[in-house]
């Protein structure tokens, strides 16, 4: 896979999140996913896709910038800044974060880990 291919997968992940399409999102996520939110809360694939489906996180928009991608055999690491417009439990919120996503080729490229932290001011 190329760096551009990984960035395209990231954009598909963001689109599925904003569309609230838990099925499309689930297809992009590894069964062993660990998703660490900028709040420090941690979700599995099951709990994260359920939260998207039930609108616990109702993503309005996700804008990525300053993305870097490194591909190493069957793994790829994406590091970027994110500006996320989301309703959390119905409460509108703007999240500015720095995120790391790890994709693996395990019979198809899927995201196995996301770790987000608040962006420095």
Listing of model-derived features with the role each one plays in the protein:
Residues 1-27, 32-121:
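A beta-strand edge to alpha-helix "cap/lid" segment located at domain peripheries
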């Amino acid at each position: 896979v190329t760096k551009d291919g990984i960035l395209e997968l990231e954009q598909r992940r963001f689109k599925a999140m904003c569309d609230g399409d838990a099925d499309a999102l689930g297809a992009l996520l590894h069964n062993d996913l660990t998703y660490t939110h900028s709040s420090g809360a941690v979700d599995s694939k099951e709990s994260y896709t359920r939260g998207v489906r039930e609108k616990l996180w109702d993503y309005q928009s996700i804008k990525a910038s300053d993305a870097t991608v490194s591909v190493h055999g069957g793994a790829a690491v994406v590091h970027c800044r994110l500006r996320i417009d989301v309703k959390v439990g119905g409460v509108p919120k703007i999240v500015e974060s720095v995120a790391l996503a790890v994709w693996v080729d395990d019979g198809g490229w899927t995201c196995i880990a996301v770790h987000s932290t608040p962006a420095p001011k």
